[in-house]
Amino acid sequence: MSTAPSKTFPDGSPDVPLLEIQGISCNYGLERAVYDLSLTVNKGEQVCLLGPSGCGKTTVLRAVAGFQPLLSGRISINGQSVSQPGEILSPEKRRVGMVFQDHALFPHLSVEQNVGSGLRTLSAVERRATVSEILERVGLMRVAQRFPHELSGGQQQRVALARALAPRPLLLLMDEPFSSLDLDLRERLGQEVADMLKANAITSILVTHDQNDAFAMGDKIGVMAEGRLLQWDTAYN
């Protein structure tokens, strides 16, 4: 498999979809996991892929992130091809942020150090300014000096979100980020995150098996089953 040439991704243009998935098929191990799936996400949209475990939704997310090769089809970000059979742009060059159920914070680093851990190319002054801005945005400034073990589950997930947003990605990918939280906290945090993403026009894809999460956060919802996209529409259509 060849690596695609280096590309520069400017901020998303309003004239092209931020993400375009065209007829992709993928395997999970030796088994086919995704069949001929197509969808488009515009700049500033929050969309969800909803379906049971094993339906292929996480495989789609991994393909968008650059961790999953394609058997067929094409993925484009901001009008530029990033994946097709035999060619894949590496994840770190895609301007994509990721938040997973296992937020995997560095236990020996403070909140602000965790958030700044992916900003090594910035100067110290620029890094501090960026971290402060992101922590303010997600409501974590007052715990900036604390360590992960001193935080609640909801706070830890906010740190993971802040860390994903710090490099200013074009697209935020979230894989079941709230499923380990209790119901009340999951609903509250999900709504807070949805409000923050909308207020800042951040384009995102949420993968979930929970219909409540999908309807709380999705401008559009894609329903998946057995590797196929069965429905793709606005949340209440």
Task: Show which residues each predicted segment covers.
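ABC ATPase "signature
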Residues: 229-233
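Short coil-to-helix segment of the ABC ATPase nucleotide-binding domain corresponding to the Q-loop/switch region
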Residues: 109-118
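A short, proline-enriched helix->beta-strand linker immediately N-terminal to the Walker B motif
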Residues: 166-170
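Catalytic Walker B motif of ABC-type/P-loop ATPase nucleotide-binding domains
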Residues: 172-176
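ABC ATPase NBD coupling module
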Residues: 82-97, 121-129
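Conserved ABC ATPase signature
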Residues: 147-151, 155-157
